[in-house]
Amino acid sequence: MGKSENTPLLELRGVYKAYKVGGFLRKVKVNAIEDIWLSLGEADIISLVGESGCGKTTTGKVAVGLLKPDKGEVLYKGKNIWEMTKEEFKEFRRNVQMMHQDPYSSLNPMLTVYKTLSAPLFRHGLASDREEAVERIARLLRLVGLTPPEEYMEKYPHQLSGGERQRVAFARTLSLNPKLIVADEPVSMIDVSLRASILNLMLDMREKFKVSYVYITHDLITARYFSRKHLLMIMYLGSIVETGQTDRIIKEPLHPYTQVLLSALPEPDPRITRSKKLIALRSLDVPSLLRMPTGCKFHPRCPFFKKGLCDVKRPTLIEVESGRRVACHLYGS
Amino acid sequence: MRPILSIKGLSVEYLSPRGRVKAVRNVNLEVYKGEILFLVGESGAGKSTLGLTLLKLLPEGIAKVVGGEVIYHRDDGGNLNILKLRKGRLRRFRWKEVAMVFQGAMNSLNPIMKIKDQMYDVIKDHGVRLSKREAYKKIEELLAMVRLDAKRVLKSYPHQLSGGMKQRVMIAMSLLLDPKLLILDEPTTALDVLTQKNIMNVLKDIRDKLHLTMIFITHDLSLAAELADRIAIMYAGSIVEVGSVEQIFYRPKHPYTHGLLKSVPKLTSEIGKLESIPGFPPDMINLPPGCKFHPRCVFRRDICMEKEPFLQKVEENHYTACWRWRDIFGEE
């Protein structure tokens, strides 16, 4: 058990991660994420939202221990995962699972559903023979809505639709009874009519087993649905720009980037979407990570840009009201 | 309203090792001059295949039109049967009458040619009688229309432009020979929200300024909500419902459309738990008998499992392919 009641399940403390890019003559270090803070407890949900290249996937990989941060700490139940013993790290990896975007490439095409799902069970000693494995897998398949399970067990990925594959992938994620699932765009390649069912399934598992989620997406609308009363974190070019309760941010976005994003988002309702007023950007171009803007990273595009301040000083994330943090000079900092 | 395109009883099949994939099945649809028609459907619904067929761009040897025709109505009153066009005429037809922009089209720009030369080549290669100066004037006008800085873009190579800029170059390029109809297949799908919004606005400008007819193919109902005049919903290769944007969004008359609308989350309005459509899309090789949606439909009766419904008139401009729409949704 954790050290105390209040020890979060997972914590990221001031995490930095840089990649080396460029040719063999001139390698440049690019900060993929900078100073990321995140904390979540049992049955908590946090949605990480941002456009491509904002560092949300890197943050996810750091959180599950697939990437080692250059600076900062990743704590699981209060313990730095990079200072764990082999045994502890193995337990951490079993309890914190990653779910990927592409159900077409995340399943081995040569393996039946049974083979895919039984391998981790045997590896982690959760089943000792075929009979036990079949029983457990049948329960998992029923849980994710693939019935009759006996029929699905013998199928290969190519015999399944995208929605079915994502359910198999989800069953695999669940097979080791994880405490936390980092789901990276789990529904973006799934058909619209099946998305809701996958998201609902994930939410059901939270109800049933108190699973926590880090939901990574570019799609604010599904993020809103998934983490309404929970947390939302908006990222831009590797930094957190705004964080707080999802519904409150959607209702009243504080950071100019969040405001622009919400104003640009099309919605599946003609009257609503056609009456939206777009907040115009100063520039449409996303700056290159190789030439990160000085001061606030959003300043070259920000409609509220103040010369001499925003292009000089990087805003820090400050708490503007209880539970809401924003990194913008409009709100002090 | 005058149609610019009439699709009559069109069916297309792909040959696969497992059997014939019935990608498009008996599609009947008129596209009216000056409208923005959205073809909305999920993967495998046949919307992209339908789009390709309209330009006779189906991969030869693999795909086959097994029935029906596509008639293009020219401004001068003449009619063209697109599927019967031969190479030379087809080539001219493709840029001058109908043009197409694909998802990821920006990747089809030649990486070692400046935008300027690629755009000029389109004009030159199609034998348009314009002086070099007139041609560049036209190119600059179109780049301005898609909100690009012509001076900068023209002398750039594709790698110097962002994805959104390249996609706008492709849109400008598709307009070079003044087509009357533009087909857009998921033109914004791989792009970020802000870039996507910009392209949607560009398309609005084009509609307002050039009065072009557009067919926009997408899986994204939000984009249809934003730009469509009319929407055709596709399922398992057929059009299951067609109507105005208002009719489809606020008074749907097909259980699939209805289910689809209830399964997408919204941002501003209050919502409870989303309901998704039960089951999975059908296998396009072994389609179920009767209505292709019946295995997933909560309203099905015996007739739905026996006979495939055809499009029936609900009200002016609004058609649904459901035997039971009156019982389920009531009359307007």
Task: Please provide the spans of the model-predicted regions.
Chain A
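ABC transporter nucleotide-binding domains
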Residues: 1-252, 263, 326, 331-333
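Charged, flexible cofactor/metal-binding loops and thiol motifs
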Residues: 8, 245-333
